[in-house]
Amino acid sequence: MRLLERGSTRYGKRVGKEKVAMGEQENTELVQRIYGSFRDGDIPALLDSLSEDVQWVTAEIEGVPVGGTWRGREQVGQFFGTLSDVQEARQLELREYVAQDDRVVALGHYAWHVKATGKVWESDFAHVLTVRDGKITRFQEYTDTAALGDAFREG
């Protein structure tokens, strides 16, 4: 059940659009901060922005060690450790944030260098983040999985 929905009532009181918009703005700012933490290499600050039971979901691709669902801060920390071991970010461009209710969609473009193969892959992406009580509870990535998989394959 959503606590805030446009035009809905909660406990007999009308919930105004201003309150929804304010929550959406705060959620967007939180998401912007985690991207800033990632850019700065401050993974502990990024992890502090996540709920204890966060779900971090990336596509499962054969031969790509950073695919799958990572549950909880500890596993997400392991995800970022593995990510750093196997790839290096060459570009991260955030183009737009779209917020509605408890979700923020980050749209952008990135380029990665895969250390084992020497290949660079790049893609536009959409990241869907869910926010509750000032923490990220879910991250879902949509990207060019063919380009990602190809970059990890030798040859």
Give the ranges of each region predicted by the language model.
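Short, low-complexity N-terminal intrinsically disordered segments enriched in polar/charged residues
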Residues: 2-52, 153-155
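Residues at secondary-structure transition points
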Residues: 22-25, 67-74, 120
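Short, mixed-charge, low-aromatic patches
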Residues: 31-41, 64-67, 83-87, 107-109
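A solvent-exposed, acidic/Ser-Thr-rich amphipathic alpha-helical stretch
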Residues: 45, 51-102
